[in-house]
Every structure is written in structure tokens, then in C-alpha cells.
Amino acid sequence: MAQKKASLACTECGSRNYSIGVSSTPKPTRLEVNKFCKYCKKYTIHKETR
């Protein structure tokens, strides 16, 4: 099975800064990662969007 692309969006400003490959099987929760946002200029939580 091929992976689908998903974006990681900043929870503070909403910009989609990162893209990741996720499996196509549905999951009950979405991925949350602490990453650097170049627009906020700080580390924030980024949530998976589709």
C-alpha cells in the first residue's frame, strides 16, 4: 500500500510548515509533534492535517 501525504499545521498561526507520509489506514487520533514554526519563530505543537 502506498502512503498518503499529510501536512503538519502550526496550532498557533495555522500555517502548514511540514509534510509527512502517513499510512492509508484510518487512525482514531491525529499526530501531534513539537516542531519549529518559521512564522512564529518558536517551537509549537504541529497537528496532522489531510
Swiss-Prot record:
Any Pfam family matching the protein: Ribosomal_L33
InterPro entries given in the database record: Ribosomal_bL33 (IPR001705), Ribosomal_bL33_sf (IPR038584), Ribosomal_zn-bd (IPR011332)
PANTHER family tied to this protein: 50S RIBOSOMAL PROTEIN L33, CHLOROPLASTIC, LARGE RIBOSOMAL SUBUNIT PROTEIN BL33B
GO biological process terms, semicolon-separated: translation
Organism superkingdom: Bacteria
Naturally occurring in which organism (per UniProt): Streptococcus agalactiae serotype V (strain ATCC BAA-611 / 2603 V/R)
Family: Belongs to the bacterial ribosomal protein bL33 family.
GN (gene name): rpmG2
Keyword terms of this UniProt record: Ribonucleoprotein, Ribosomal protein
Protein name according to UniProt: Large ribosomal subunit protein bL33B
